[in-house]
């Protein structure tokens, strides 16, 4: 039994580096332009969904959270616009078809408690991903202003994540 247990432990331990690489790949290195594209799309989607929460959500906490996200991500988009412009990077000004189909369209069909549940889940997942990417950009951006922008945006994203987790637990 001991040799079997030892072998099993060796197999599990030898797979941990691969698992760590997979997690690290989620926040893979991006060019500054790719980060601007990601951040702008994220801001526009979050602001749009936040506004939608005002009419489609059933609980007041979800509506309030959506209103906060709409305001915060609109402000963040404007800050990103200024930084991108100074860095001579292109700034998307509309949600692209891919993000519309993946993020906006599914919510158009939901109302009430179903909207609330799906919104909370997506906000936890989305903010978890965004935080990893922003941390990477805050450390590795080529442009100093973009690096600073990413670092300054992190506390707001982290608050959004914690609030979304609270909404998810309440459902």
Question: Which residues does each predicted region cover?
Answer:
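His/Met- and acidic-residue-enriched segments that coordinate or traffic transition-metal cofactors
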Residues: 2-6, 12-171
């Amino acid at each position: 039994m001991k040799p079997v247990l030892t072998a099993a432990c060796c197999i599990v331990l030898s797979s941990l580096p691969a698992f760590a690489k997979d997690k690290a790949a989620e926040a893979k290195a991006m060019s500054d332009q790719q980060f601007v594209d990601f951040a702008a799309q994220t801001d526009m989607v979050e602001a749009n969904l936040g506004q939608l929460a005002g009419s489609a959500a059933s609980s007041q906490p979800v509506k309030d959270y959506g209103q906060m996200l709409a305001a915060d991500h609109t402000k963040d988009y404007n800050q990103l616009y200024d930084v991108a412009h100074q860095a001579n990077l292109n700034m998307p000004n509309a949600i692209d078809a891919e993000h519309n189909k993946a993020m906006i369209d599914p919510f158009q069909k939901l109302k009430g408690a179903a909207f609330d549940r799906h919104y909370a889940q997506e906000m936890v997942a989305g903010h978890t991903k965004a935080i990893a990417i922003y941390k990477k950009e805050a450390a590795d951006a080529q442009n100093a202003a973009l690096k600073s922008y990413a670092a300054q945006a992190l506390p707001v994203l982290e608050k959004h994540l914690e609030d979304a987790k609270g909404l998810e637990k309440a459902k």
